[in-house]
């Protein structure tokens, strides 16, 4: 199973944006993704602790953080969820990488981008498709 946070992918009418858990088949469905990659931490113990923390966060029923505010632990965005799970294991995948950017009508500060986690030397690729 894959725990993740995503906006605008409701599972049923009236579903809210939240931390979700889905099968790999659904997560990597061509409806949701054109390409994919499975990566794991090089230390199995770290990966195990991070996985348990991701499950705990899922069970909390946290909403998706549309403000992309990593100072607010009551809501999580996608990369923040991954970083928080690994921090519980004592590891930062994003390290100090953060971004400030603006899009029309919004200004975001200190955001962890997916590429910040992807660039971690602590992860190894298991599969690409």
Feature map (PLM): residue ranges:
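Activation targets extended, charge/polar-rich intrinsically disordered C-terminal tails
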Residues: 66-129
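Glycine-rich catalytic cores of cysteine/serine-nucleophile enzymes that process amide/ester linkages
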Residues: 1-40, 63-76
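Sec/Tat-exported extracytoplasmic proteins
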Residues: 6, 42-45, 54-62, 85-93, ...
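A broad, structure-centric signal for solvent-exposed, well-ordered loop/edge residues
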Residues: 9-12, 45-48, 100, 124
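Short, surface-exposed linear patches
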Residues: 24-26, 59-62, 87, 98-100
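Short hydrophobic/aromatic-rich motifs at helix boundaries and adjacent loops
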Residues: 22-26, 51-56
